[in-house]
Amino acid sequence: MKYNANTSNQFRAMFFKNATFLKRQKCSLGVQIAIPMALVIVLVILKLWIESQIENNSGPVGDSSGDDIMGSYISYKFDYMQGWFYTINPNNITNIGYKDGYGNGTGLLGGINQYEIYWNGSDLWVPYTVAVESGQKMNDMVLAQKQQLGQSSMGPLTFPIAGIQFNEFNPQNNLIDLTITCEQQIRYAYNNFENNLIYVLSQIQTSFINYLLNGNGVVVKTQISTLPYIYKSQQFDIASLLGGSFFPFALSFVLPLFMYSIVYEKQEKLRDLSLMMGLKMRNYWIMTFIFNFLTYVVIVSVISLICSAAKVSLFVKGSPFALFLLLFLWGLSMVSFAFFLSTFFKRTRAASIFGYFFVMVMVNLNSTLSLFNTSVPVFYYWVPILAFSRGISTLCGLCGNGLCPPLSQYTWDFELSRILFWLFIDTIVYLTLAVYLDKVLPREFGVPSHPLFFIKDLKELFSKKGKYRKLRDGDGINEKTKLINEYTIDGINNDDDDDGLMDEDVKKERDMIVKGEYNPEEMTLIVQGLRKQFPGRPKPALSNLYLSVKKGEVLGYLGPNGAGKTTSISILTGLYTPTSGTAHIAGLDIRYDMDKIHQVIGVVMQFDVLWEDLTCEETILYYTRLKGTPKSIEFESTHNILKEVNLLDVKDRFVKELSGGMKRRLSFAIAMTGESSIIFLDEPTTGLSIETRKDLWGTINELKKNRSIILTTHSMQEADILSDRIAIVSQGKLQCIGTQTHLKQKFGDGYSVRIDIQEDYQNTHNPTDLIKSFSPSATLSETFNGSYVYRLPKDSIISDLYEYLVLNKEQYHLQEWSLSQTSLEDVFLKISANDDTVN
């Protein structure tokens, strides 16, 4: 039963796999949640603490509801004030006078209202006056006092209350003109008043009136208060003001983690295996995008709830829709930008280090530029994290000062509107670049596409594909002539290879396929003139390959490295497209039906490609869902597959806890998902112990009962034991094909006989004459300590040789002998002797 792997099935498979895998990544998940939460919690704590300090240190205020109107009374009382005034008389005006610390005085200043204090062991009348020559002299004296005080934490307060410069004094005209110099630094002011000016004016007014009234004891006292007011809470919000630095970090730290997840699947070849098993590349990008964005949404939602509960202005004032757009578009552009950056990395470590470094540098760069509050060039908006950081910082600054912009303010002239636009553009541009660069940049596994691949795809879409589709009669191979027609349509010349140089069996295989001389119902795989030419390489990686595999057959597909094995399998599994030619798998054409073909093939890669933090059951469930197994039977199908490879008892065990043999069987189980018709085994037992290897051989023999298998291996023993037929490729061409016995007889050098002489006769007897008398063309190939090895031609009759040795055993003192045919390894080495990659 074949299943339909539609988009919804693949979305479901990827979502559950990603969610389960992320849940198991406790460290990664902790970082994703802890860093943003920690930053926001610190921000909220700072907000609450600073607000409490402001509350505790504020003066009388009105009702916060704003319904009551009241007056606030603030009185400056000058009792027990001690200090002095500097007086400056640059015009030598008469009758200015003075007032000393003993209560004596003359002229205008003699009318200052004093009081007595006890100071340094004696009585002192204050305030008193000290005359100085000029304002500059006064300033020098004050600065010297401040410098001296700055070097000592304690000491007597010797600062003047103020400096008074008399510009004009004319009692006859009731005129006085003066300049008052007051202390403005809180550090040097007295603790019982805030404004020296009020006190100085009171004293001057008292002196002036007493002077005019001839000293009648007038005292002027001044009090100040505010007008009535309606109370409003402070307009600034410290959390929003500080949020300009906190929020960009909190909402950007997931970017490196998104990069990590994509690079990890490339590095471990997990994505490649998923593609071979039927995952559509567009579905991979879409689902990865959605999953990463949902992860971001969860983090943003939690942050928003915390900040809303703490009444951070950014989240409770202004336009909720505008804030939603900013956060929403940042999420989209961040995921796209993470995709874009991930295309340049092959290792997770490098991607993570760069990601975190990039985030910190960009956020700090924006914070530095924001201090100058200058406009930025357009290219600034092409980096999403800079655009978002500037947008959120600007919004935080406005809301922090009680100026949250309403939605009506978001016009094109408002920078935040332009930032929203650029984040949308960044999303589209970087997502497009990510998909494009992923196809064309050099990669560790596979060959990149041509930079202009999309032109070829468009050309084929409107030309060849349409023409070909009109000639097709169905999805299966139901007529022998169908292949002949397709062979002609593609323009494949069956004389591409020189018939005189082509092996007879290879030519026979080709003619059988071209002429349709086979039963389509018995065939799982038909390869027709498959060719692959990579750009920039002088020779094709694969040249005019014809091959067939029957149902239930194991084909040993052998060849040296670089011979074309991997290229041909990559084409058959959909990783590459052929330059010319085609192939049919279960009646489906690899050029046009690859989505359906992925549902009927399984792949076991050379090394185990597994998610270490998934269980056996979760691993198989992912691929079962990927291939479209109905939801109602997906668990039943998973358990049946695990049972078939003897892993059902450990279905809940994590992959990282499995032995090497168990992991290999799990890889076989992956290939069996979705009722696979054909399985590609790439070096299935590499690196395993002999016991584990033999156990897996038994598993492979069980698998082939219902499926066809293509086996690639460098173990000739493995190929000899498991294969029904052997195909050897070299220099991109099929060199020979047939059963093991047939190939050994055809390409082997005959037989090898080993004879051991009894120990007492090793120096006196030599069996060479005996072997030569049986076969004159026999040759001695090896001798050592009474042991002789001879090569016999392949037309030798083994039964006659055995009888001949028995008859002459006593005469030649033969102790024992053994016979062996030419090995498959000998055939392989002979076939590949002229391969450039070997030599």
Curated annotation (Swiss-Prot):
PROSITE patterns: ABC_TRANSPORTER_1, ABC_TRANSPORTER_2. ATP binds at residues 559-566. Pfam families: ABC2_membrane_3, ABC_tran, R1_ABCA1. It is found in: Membrane. Keywords: ATP-binding, Membrane, Nucleotide-binding, Transmembrane, Transmembrane helix, Transport. InterPro entries: AAA+_ATPase, ABC2_TM, ABC_transporter-like_ATP-bd, ABC_transporter-like_CS, ABCA, P-loop_NTPase, R2_ABCA1-4-like. The chain crosses the membrane at residues 30-50, 238-258, 286-306, 321-341, 352-372, 378-398, 419-439. GO terms for cellular component: intracellular membrane-bounded organelle; membrane. Residues 525-756 form the ABC transporter domain. The keyword Cytoplasm does not apply. GO terms for biological process: lipid transport; sorocarp development; sorocarp morphogenesis. GO terms for molecular function: ABC-type transporter activity; ATP binding; ATP hydrolysis activity; ATPase-coupled transmembrane transporter activity; lipid transporter activity. It is a multi-pass membrane protein. Belongs to the ABC transporter superfamily. ABCA family. This is ABC transporter A family member 7. It comes from Dictyostelium discoideum (Social amoeba).
